[in-house]
Design a protein with these regions (language model features):
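Secretory targeting and sorting signals
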Residues: 1-34, 42
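Predominantly soluble domains enriched in secretory-pathway, periplasmic, or organellar proteins
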Residues: 22, 28-380
Length: 380
């Protein structure tokens, strides 16, 4: 398939933005209307009965079951082996070197012992006006979440329906919230600088990233809007997830498989590099050598855009685009860097209950059952 680039078609403007929000699914649009019942994709995966609980092997996957109240442990060869109840609609998760997972749910941040496979605590949010814990893309509560490099603090982005969100700082030893910092609307993703001095909240509905000083909790807003902000809450062309580049600490935001926005968090300046997948993009991760992986969820406009894919972008900018079957949301990479695991949960319609396992060398893919609408993922 010939993939069109940003240079090969007109720049999208408000007409496309508003038309997409009206005609297509409203998953990325900032609305607080009640969602219709979500229906998963009908593409089948072969279920595997959970195995008895036991020692969690290295390389086991942990996924957040956004359509349930659990996290699921997944053998990357066989499928689910166990699950642990954590709280309503878990979204993102982060795992420390001590094996404890911190899971952002609608109710609070759950702490899970991944070795014993049990929940140790549920830390309630201090942010107000979250509403009753519920399911759906626009629910109140935790979204993106990240650990400080030294493991002493967790930072969770908290969505406040119809308002700006917050980043809550949690002391991991005390297991309590120590600070609540205002940020933009719907903090999809949270990342931390290499030295732990700054926290970055990707504010989906504000077209920006909020830079939070980890000590003083002072904030700076940096706009991330390569297509402009026309359309406001109805726009699809917003930032979703970011990656911190290991070589220089700059933030990488993929947009539409056309543009990679590279933000210098120190100066607030950004540059744009060309991408080639030509598809709406959500989850990202980056490997220690600087290889960026970006999840393409599928087209905004089927007449213009390509289908779901995984972009593997080398540090020199060369890209391999691997087609995927159906929408996906987030991605993690095996310790040896050879395999990617892409969650099928998705924040919009078309989600499915599994992950796609991608051989990054050959580009071969296979589907694996995994939880209920899995979003966040980590390799244990």
């Amino acid at each position: 398939v010939t993939r069109r680039t940003a240079e090969g078609r007109p720049v999208r403007r408000a007409a496309l933005t508003l038309a997409a929000a009206t005609v297509l699914l409203a998953g990325c649009a900032g609305t607080t209307q009640a969602e219709p019942d979500r229906k998963p994709s009908t593409v089948p995966v072969t279920p595997t009965a959970p195995a008895p609980s036991g020692r969690t092997a290295d390389g086991t996957l942990l996924v957040a079951d956004f359509g349930a109240d659990t996290v699921t442990f997944v053998d990357p060869d066989k499928g689910p082996v166990d699950s642990v109840k954590v709280g309503t609609a878990p979204y993102g998760l982060a795992v420390g070197e001590d094996g404890r997972a911190w899971v952002a749910t609608a109710e609070g941040v759950a702490v899970v012992d991944t070795e014993a496979r049990r929940r140790l605590a549920l830390i309630p949010y201090e942010t107000e006006n979250l509403g009753e814990p519920t399911h759906g893309e626009y629910r109140g509560g935790g979204m993106g979440i990240a650990l400080a490099p030294d493991g002493k603090h967790v930072y969770v982005g908290v969505n406040v329906p119809d308002a700006n969100g917050t980043v809550e700082t949690i002391d991991t030893a005390a297991r309590e919230v120590t600070d609540v910092t205002p940020v933009g609307r719907r903090p999809f993703d949270v990342d931390v600088s290499r030295d732990g001095d700054e926290v970055y909240a990707t504010d989906h509905d504000s077209f920006d990233v909020t830079v939070v000083d980890a000590r003083s909790h002072d904030t700076r807003r940096i706009e991330v809007a390569p297509y402009g902000t026309e359309g406001g809450l109805g726009s699809w062309l917003k930032p979703h997830y970011a990656a911190v580049r290991p070589s220089d600490g700059k933030l990488l935001f993929p947009f539409e498989g056309e543009k990679l926005v590279v933000v210098d968090p120190d100066t607030g300046r950004s540059t744009i590099e060309r991408m080639t997948a030509n598809t709406h993009q959500h989850g990202v991760t980056i490997t220690p050598d600087g290889t960026l992986l970006a999840v393409g969820t599928g087209p905004i406009d089927p007449a213009e855009d390509e289908g779901p894919s995984l972009t593997v972008r080398a540090p020199d900018g060369k890209e391999k685009v691997i087609p995927l079957d159906g929408p996906h949301e987030d991605v993690a990479v095996s310790a040896d860097g050879r395999t990617a695991y892409v969650t099928g949960g998705f924040t919009r319609d078309g989600y499915w209950n599994g992950i796609t396992v991608v051989d990054l060398g050959s580009g071969d893919t296979r589907r694996l059952p995994a939880g209920e609408r899995p979003l966040g993922i980590a390799v244990l």
